């Protein structure tokens, strides 16, 4: 019985290590609306959805939006910009821009609806706002760690700015999507098997 119990422990440990070695990409999603804007909600019927996927050091940003009251900023004299991810703050307040400024490269400008996708290397300074790097030790690694921690803690938000709402027309807090529960189910099964072994041993081998 000890050998079987030991084998179960070994299998569990191997599964855990395999999970670390072959970690699934981290996925975060946000539903964007004017009501989510802070400190003042925006009176906008606009809606949007954003997905941020982090696979190793590569981040993929995908977003779609529609129904904005005003067009996304196109670098007009107002100084507003189209879209960013801000870090690090809860949904009740605001934070500085973490991602490239003045906006995500290639984000649709001068429109009330659109879609976007792009990839960023989180080990490059060009993937961040210089001010965010300076605020986190002055290094790209410091910015990377702070940004990832913000994502995983639910302290980042996706914000789309328009000419009518330079502070942001629609916003959504990025929330982590739970990872597959494979290891949890495996762990539950192993625990159940171990309990059955112990019970059988106490019963003297009787079923």
Please give the residue ranges for each predicted region.
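Intrinsically disordered, low-complexity repeat segments enriched in small/polar residues
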Residues: 5, 185, 202-203
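N-terminal leader/targeting pre-sequences
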Residues: 24-176
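Sec/Tat signal peptide C-region and signal peptidase I cleavage site
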Residues: 19-23
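Bacterial N-terminal signal peptides
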Residues: 8-16
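Bacterial N-terminal signal peptides that target proteins for export
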Residues: 1-8
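A short, hydrophobic C-terminal helix/tail in secreted or cell-surface proteins
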Residues: 179-197
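C-terminal membrane-anchoring or membrane-association module
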Residues: 194-207
């Amino acid at each position: 019985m000890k050998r079987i119990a030991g084998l179960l422990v070994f299998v569990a440990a191997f599964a855990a290590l395999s999970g670390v070695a072959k970690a699934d990409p981290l996925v975060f999603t946000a539903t964007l609306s004017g009501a989510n804007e802070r400190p003042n909600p925006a009176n906008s019927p606009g809606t949007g959805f954003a997905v941020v996927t982090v696979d190793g050091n590569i981040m993929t940003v995908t977003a779609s939006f529609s129904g904005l009251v005003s067009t996304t900023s196109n670098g007009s004299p107002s100084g507003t910009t189209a879209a960013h991810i801000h870090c690090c703050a809860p949904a009740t307040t605001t934070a500085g821009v973490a991602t490239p400024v003045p906006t995500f490269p290639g984000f649709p400008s001068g429109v009330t609806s659109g879609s976007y996708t792009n990839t960023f290397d989180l080990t490059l300074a060009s993937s961040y706002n210089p001010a965010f790097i300076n605020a986190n030790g002055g290094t790209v690694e410091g910015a990377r760690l702070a940004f990832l921690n913000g994502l995983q803690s639910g302290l980042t938000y996706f914000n789309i700015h328009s000419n009518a709402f330079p502070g942001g027309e629609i916003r959504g807090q990025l929330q982590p999507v739970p990872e597959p529960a494979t290891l949890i189910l495996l762990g539950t099964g192993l625990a159940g098997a171990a309990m059955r072994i112990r019970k059988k041993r106490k019963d003297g081998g009787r079923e």
